[in-house]
Amino acid sequence: MDWQGHNLHFSDHVIHYYGNGNVGKPALVFCHGFSDNGLCWHRVALRFTDQFDIYLLDARNHGQSSRGIASAQDMTQDLADVITALELEPVIAVGHSMGAGTVAALAADYPHLVAKMILEDPAWSDEDDTQKTKSMRKRAAGFAKYLEMIARLSDDQLLAMGRAQHPSWSLEDFPSWVQSKREVDGFALKGLIRSPWQTLIENITCPALLLYADETSDGIVQQNVVDQILSLNPCFQCKQITGAGHNLRREQFEAYITAIEAFLN
């Protein structure tokens, strides 16, 4: 499918998104993780294209959206502004990692904009403030080195690296993954710092599905965090995807789709 690309112009920035033009159907909005882009949802979105009006957003400093300093709060505001400008509310919002944090913040701060949400392994842990600061600095430094490294690779080299690192992924996932790595800006690192997730959880009132990985994998959300979420907010359902790491949908695609379909139905 050829997704239709569009730009939304705001006062000082542009947000790019892709859609299927299925106006009149319920809106399903996807928010990607750090260094990905909207098209990285292509394979999942195809499974829902007949039932929904789909929007694949490029976050600021990713894809074809604007470059420049943008905080996590700015990205939440961007998502709210897009939904409002296109008169989509209330939407079903899906997010992975960084995008999951954006979706959760949207549901907490703008409850009227979100009917349901699905979060794929957000960056939520039970570290204390000191540990979180250290972890964030370590992650930011690691991401910065990663961006420098991939900038030196050709597309063929980047594809070979991706396939070697992620042998369980479908070949369909790699074209958008390679493209996204050419479209991420260093300013994107500023969007990774967000308020404590516990505060967000307490303010969420819509039905929510959290999908998390095996504890032995590279997933971020651990069982103790899941237990805290369920104790803090009865709106949440939490499901572990067996055999998956942080990129749940790419590693256990059918199980991921089945979980979403069950939640939406």
Positions of PLM-derived features:
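Conserved loop-alpha-helix segment in the C-terminal half of the alpha/beta-hydrolase fold
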Residues: 46, 209-244
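Hydrolases whose catalytic domains are alpha/beta-hydrolase-1, hotdog thioesterase
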Residues: 102-106
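Flexible "cap/lid" loop of the alpha/beta hydrolase fold
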Residues: 108, 115-147
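Conserved HGGG/HGGXW glycine-rich cap/lid loop of the alpha/beta-hydrolase fold
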Residues: 13-64
